[in-house]
Regions:
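Residue-level signal for inorganic ion chemistry
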Residues: 13, 63, 121, 183, ...
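C-terminal substrate-recognition/cap domain of FAD-linked oxidoreductases
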Residues: 24-32, 224, 230-235, 241-403, ...
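N-terminal accessory segments
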Residues: 1-36, 66-68, 310-327, 414-419, ...
Length: 468
């Protein structure tokens, strides 16, 4: 039964956004209270769906008055528990989920400036379609493009397959609009390419995971649309062979768009899931490397030249045909889907780590990760972004995920790497932040957060332990 204060809170929220957009029934809230992995979940009093930056500000001010926490959420495709409420515990404040899925306005593409303004609920696919309609393209892409949104991609500083060429989401944000914990609207959507007037809101909020302000819109950079593409799937004898291939590609292929890595376990899993045999295969395969090139003319000649001279290749397939390329890319894009299906079969949510190390340490990382998985008795399925030394380590049927994390993340830190390359910290990796950040660094980050949100209202427990 709701208290009088809770009833009043719901009434005020309903006045702010409309009663139809304040979801209080258990069955309506359920999908917003659990994340995509199924591993992280927590209860909320209500899900509130504002339709404008003014409504976002009003909701935040109401939450402040009633001393409830607020969890910003859009596509809810996060993998580290940062987009859902924290588990219920004695004495904890109640939570409101703010769903930004109604903020879907997309401005006219400015083809001269190569920019567009998008609200936080616009999906990456919609962003890309808008750019394509104007003869341009988007610089960030990843498999969850149909549901992942602009707001979430900025909040986590998302990466994806095109980081090699264009950088992470932070580099694409040339203007931002957000609402602070005081309900104040800050930032600018002007998109000036040169501006040095004080602190840069886009840089501050990218990667802040909803802890400093709620992102409501952004002015985004666009890039040329290279309509001639070539994709190669290459089987190599060793991780060292893959790294040498990467170096050769970087030196010689000016159209290089992405260089991905797929472990044989991941290739077998996705192959079984989609019902297609791998396009390349050999008993000698230690690793698969997927290469994407894109240009204004056929980029395959440079790519073929490098592949013909590279050592350690045991098999390869290359295509410029759109249908065949889509088939090749499916072996990368549907890995996460295949992992989720396999985890459903064993009845245990996938335990995921997203790490990066210097390229010369990748071999050591893979050995440590496999050893930790073997000790646990679970199935390790690695894939990722070779150019950035970024591996997604997926554990199917893990019995003791914390032990795996301790082993792997400690090794990552000792190898000079990071415990989060693109998925963010969320709540999942907070206990290991001290591996890569010294106390002064953590104190400074906490001070920034306290200055903007002294009541710890916005996404408490994310990036820092709750209450710090």
């Amino acid at each position: 039964m709701q208290s009088a204060a809770q009833v009043d809170l719901i009434e005020e929220l309903s006045l702010a956004v409309g009663a139809a957009h304040v979801l209080v029934d258990d069955d309506l809230r359920a999908a917003y209270e659990v994340d995509w992995t199924g591993r992280y979940q927590g209860p909320c009093n209500a899900v509130v769906r504002p339709n404008s930056v003014e409504e976002v500000a009003a909701v935040i001010r109401i939450c402040a008055v009633y001393d409830v926490t607020l969890v910003p959420q859009a596509g809810n495709t996060g993998l580290v528990g940062g987009s859902v409420p924290r588990p219920a515990r004695s004495g904890a404040r109640s939570a409101i989920v703010m769903s930004l899925t109604r903020l879907t306005r997309l401005g006219r593409v400015d083809t001269a400036a190569m920019q567009v303004t998008a609200e936080a609920g616009v999906t990456l696919t919609t962003w890309r379609e808008s750019a394509h309609n104007a003869g341009l393209d988007t610089p960030v892409d990843f498999a969850a493009r149909d549901t992942a949104t602009i707001g979430g991609a900025i909040a986590t500083n998302a990466g994806g397959s095109r980081v090699l060429r264009f950088g992470t989401m932070r580099r694409q944000v040339v203007g931002i609009e957000a609402v602070t914990a005081k309900g104040a609207i800050v930032g600018s959507l002007g998109g000036l390419p040169k501006e040095t007037a004080g602190l840069h809101w886009p840089s501050l909020l990218a990667g802040s995971e909803g802890t400093l302000a709620v992102i409501t819109a952004a002015r985004l950079r666009l890039v040329p649309w290279f309509q001639h593409t070539a994709t190669a799937l290459v089987a190599v004898k060793s991780i060292e062979s893959g790294i040498r291939l990467l170096a050769a590609l970087r030196r010689s292929v000016t159209s290089l768009d992405a260089v991905e890595v797929i472990a044989p376990t991941a290739m077998r899993l996705v192959s079984d899931h989609i019902g297609q045999p791998p396009p390349v295969s050999s008993p000698e395969t230690a690793l698969y490397v997927m290469v994407d090139c894109a240009d204004h003319s056929d980029p395959s000649e440079q790519l073929l030249d490098v592949l013909s001279q590279a050592d350690g290749i045991v098999d390869s397939a290359i295509t410029t045909d759109a249908v065949q390329r889509k088939r090749l890319v499916a072996f990368r894009d549907r890995i996460t889907e295949a992992i989720a299906a396999a985890s459903t079969e064993v009845g245990v949510p996938t335990f995921k780590l997203d790490v990066a190390v210097p390229l010369d340490a990748l071999g050591d990382l893979i050995k440590v990760a496999q050893g930790a998985a073997d000790a646990d008795g679970c199935r390790l399925v690695p894939f990722g972004h070779l150019a950035e030394g970024n591996l997604h380590l997926n554990h199917i049927g893990a019995s003791h995920p914390e032990r795996i994390a301790d082993t792997v993340l400690s090794a990552v830190a000792s190898l000079g790497g990071t415990i989060s390359a693109e998925h963010g910290i969320g709540v999942a990796k907070v206990p290991w932040m001290s591996l890569i950040r010294n106390p002064a660094d953590l104190d400074a980050q906490a001070a920034i957060r306290t200055a903007l949100d002294p009541a710890d209202m916005l996404n408490p427990g994310v990036l820092h332990p709750q209450g710090t």
